[in-house]
């Protein structure tokens, strides 16, 4: 279960999500509720059975035959979903997976470093996930492959207690 929210001058998401994963780290069930960045209602569900996948969100109400390992991407993801995808990719053959509703993603490790903050010192790894957008998506994971940080030109999410590490993460 994950709760995610931020306030950007009165805007920003407020989302509660729960994930059930199989042994390979692929979603079996997802439930996501709350509001998106513009405060529109969010109510997403995903279920994978032995032979089919079904999902419903503001844009889709779909059912498809299950044709192999695949990772479902929600319409309004919380940052933890990126870490779940990264872990699933790291455990997948050739570190690649099909995506649902469409696409294929791959992952590669770019760098490793040690970071320090009020919460201590951690060894973290920078990964690039390709196939989600035109440019690879960058994500930092700790050595337990848990979300550590995500950085872009307009925002940074980092594990609490490691805010002092943002400049080092930014330089990578």
Residue ranges and their predicted role:
Residues 1-57, 119, 131:
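N-terminal mature ectodomain segment of secretory-pathway/periplasmic proteins
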Residues 1, 5, 9-12, 18-22, ...:
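Gly/Pro-enriched, hydrophobic low-complexity segments
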Residues 37-129, 144, 148-151, 156-160, ...:
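Solvent-exposed helix/loop surface patches that form functional interfaces
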């Amino acid at each position: 279960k994950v709760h995610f929210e931020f306030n950007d001058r009165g805007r920003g998401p407020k989302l509660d999500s729960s994930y059930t994963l199989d042994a390979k780290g692929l979603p079996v069930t997802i439930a996501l509720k709350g509001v998106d960045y513009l405060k529109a209602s969010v109510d997403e569900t995903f279920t994978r059975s032995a032979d089919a996948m079904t999902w419903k969100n503001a844009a889709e109400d779909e059912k498809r035959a299950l044709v192999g390992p695949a990772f479902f991407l929600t319409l309004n993801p919380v940052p933890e979903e990126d870490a779940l995808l990264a872990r699933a990719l790291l455990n997948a053959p050739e570190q690649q997976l099909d995506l649902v509703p469409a696409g294929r993603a791959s992952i590669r490790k770019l760098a490793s470093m040690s970071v320090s903050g009020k919460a201590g010192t951690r060894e973290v790894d920078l990964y690039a996930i390709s196939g989600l957008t035109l440019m690879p998506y960058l994500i930092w994971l700790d050595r337990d492959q848990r979300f550590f940080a995500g950085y872009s030109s307009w925002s940074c999410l980092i594990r609490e207690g490691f805010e002092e590490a943002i400049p080092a993460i930014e330089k990578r």
